[in-house]
């Protein structure tokens, strides 16, 4: 019997977000490159130690990234947009950051960052590779070798990991050219061979190559390339081909013909019959079984898996046990949590605990530990199910009573829009922001002091109102048409709302990486959800009292709250979403009754939640759209409902977006140079739309000319009566200098376009 333990990847930000703080200090020139590199090295060292101490046979190397692991491959093969490296200089870490964050080029011209979008259906974001004609690729960035040498020098058995060449090409975009991405394979594969040779010379036996596109419905020409690609790569080192996030049975005909030595399958995302599945897989492959959920934080029922694997061992006793996918998507360590009770903590496994689960199951299977260890491990699972925290009968009854009348607006958009124009009196090309304003150190300290009970509620509310007043004054001075209160009271767009909802619990240190230095702390849904008290009414009502201009209230939508939380697993996502939607409906109606005429319900995760297989889309979109409409449809015709979406491809779900029936939708488009709007050549969007005119994720200040250019491009596809003007996203991560200058330019560009329009 030979069972090995490993994981596909490990959280990379450090126990206390050391990577985040080191990056931000480096970008603001508050620490040196040497200091940054040392912190990265220490994080990797600690990660590998944690894996070995938790019983892994291999340490996974190559999962660390300064910004993003897809960008690591772009650096490795020298796929750097010319604007960021016009003279083809030797690459360094600053090149990487220029691609990710944008920079100033020759003559102080702004070089835009590469696009950023969601990694499959997760809340992690990757930097989209750009492909152009006549690119020259070579082995330019040797991070994978340097980190392998680091781990070897510490005496570890190393399993390197790289994103596979076909998935890398699939995720990229062709820019200003008509090349076929697959034609680039012949240029890229020799670099992978170079890496394999280097690793082989270091006596590395296995390399993990991630090809998650094998869970998708990939076209025939892509399927065809898999066989020739892996035949080309065969021979230098054993390949463990890793698939995750879904079912691969529809692509087994290709996979079984590949020249690989091992196959990782995600047994969590798709509920396979393991015995049946194994009989349909090439019996020459070593199987890596992904049985520990890498995307959620609940303990695994190891006893259930013990019996399944005992049966499996009757036909195959040579396999590996692993996480379903990289543990990048979960926090690092549950044991450091201070504000959860031991009873609640016992339900969860974070990154380190997931490694322990793999090891524990492996040891019992190999008779090194008694089965009672598994029974003890799963006791909290049974205690959770019977806990009074979980079930709320009044919530369940209200959810069952949802009727079709509750998710239909009183009149169609053409009727509503006329009434809203009379109510709001907005100009052509109305200007607004997405919601948040800079979260200064003063604001963060204020919230922390209140949380730690250093100031009382009365003083806290007084100080928050001072910040709201500053935000309103600033916006009026700038000349924005629709104002926001700026969200100084909000720590996070999901956590803030979940704190007002029964059914959630919260961690103190449960951070996960979203992109680069951006980390989020997802709340955990443990029970039925209901609103405890109004969540935003007081702040929006106060902001509206300060101005005659309309103030827009901001809520996070039900799908996004679901997708950006760790959900419970005992009921369906549809049921969870409906519970959230009912709570938000109550909030929307309270806002309307308080005199708020514009209410924005953000759904940036709508596309992210889409299943990876197209045949499952309709069912998901049915309940996702329904949940939005439950929130939004109880209002009067005069109340304008907005929604906001970012980081995603909208075109394939545009009918569903229309079905939301929001009066105004704002979307992120600036990084793609309004590319998303190409869809509107053939599709007439019926309601109003605000494509983002500048990238808030970059510190670069957009020029008036660049914004005018984007607005003119948008006007080719959208009528001026439908078009709104706004940044791509909220401004919480920017400072006030950047924010003011960018908004000034946005408003000037809008005035220029208005003048030009009225001259015609």
Curated annotation (Swiss-Prot):
Zn(2+) binds at residues 644, 646, 668, 729. Its EC number is 2.1.1.14. Pathway: Amino-acid biosynthesis; L-methionine biosynthesis via de novo pathway; L-methionine from L-homocysteine (MetE route): step 1/1. Keywords: Amino-acid biosynthesis, Metal-binding, Methionine biosynthesis, Methyltransferase, Repeat, Transferase, Zinc. Binds 1 zinc ion per subunit. Its cofactor is Zn(2+). It is an enzyme of class 2 (transferase). L-homocysteine binds at residues 434-436, 487, 602. Coiled coil: none annotated. This is 5-methyltetrahydropteroyltriglutamate--homocysteine methyltransferase.
